[in-house]
């Protein structure tokens, strides 16, 4: 993809989570799905999201800490990330001794873990948490319904921060410390981040 000659690494396959969708679009999808299904459908609040991600654990992740081997649990920035450095007319991963590699192999990563996915992988490729939920902390991060204000909610937010929406979880390009069940990120509702998708809550009417 760096040479604009091939599609590169596919991130739009049916089994992969949706990305590059704004909060506005994700919320509109939930509303439309609710009308079609007759159920209450919505994005989770960040409190709901964290409760589900932790699955009863008080640690960084349901499976352990930021130093745990996440290879069979979540798709995060691991040793496969080095293969994002590519070269050639039909791009292939650069050799380890390629002098240009240092200019492309710049993403921070955990080199002693291999989760066997370069970018986003098929949903449910890794072990579920104790409550049966997949990919809560990895693969792609997720929009929530919540405004980006101080959390837990103790103070009033100013207009600038309240305009943003909370994103929770990590992704294939983020290290564990940026992917824990407590980490918060924020984007404006019209933004379409390349590593952010969403999941929904479905309740009977």
Give the location of each predicted region.
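Functional-site microenvironments in short loops/helix caps that host divalent-cation chemistry
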Residues: 3-183, 192-194
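Short, structured beta-strand segments at or near domain termini in extracellular proteins/domains
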Residues: 194-205
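C-terminal beta-signal and terminal closure region of outer-membrane beta-barrel proteins
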Residues: 188-189
């Amino acid at each position: 993809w760096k040479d604009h000659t091939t599609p590169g690494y596919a991130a739009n396959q049916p089994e992969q989570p949706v990305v590059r969708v704004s909060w506005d679009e994700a919320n509109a999808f939930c509303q439309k799905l609710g009308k079609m299904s007759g159920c209450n459908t919505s994005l989770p609040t960040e409190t709901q999201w964290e409760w589900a991600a932790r699955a009863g654990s008080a640690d960084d992740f349901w499976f352990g800490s930021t130093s745990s081997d996440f290879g069979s649990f979540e798709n995060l920035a691991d040793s496969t990330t080095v293969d994002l450095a590519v070269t050639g007319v039909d791009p292939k991963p650069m050799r380890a001794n390629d002098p240009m590699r240092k200019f492309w192999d710049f993403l921070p990563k955990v080199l002693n873990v291999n989760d066997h996915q370069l970018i986003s992988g098929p949903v449910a490729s890794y072990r579920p948490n104790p409550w049966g939920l997949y990919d809560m902390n990895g693969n792609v991060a997720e929009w929530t319904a919540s405004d980006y204000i101080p959390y837990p909610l103790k103070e009033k937010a100013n207009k600038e921060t309240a305009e943003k929406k909370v994103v929770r979880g990590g992704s294939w390009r983020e290290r564990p410390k940026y992917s824990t069940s407590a980490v918060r990120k924020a984007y404006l509702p019209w933004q379409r981040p390349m590593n952010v998708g969403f999941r929904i809550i479905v309740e009977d009417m």
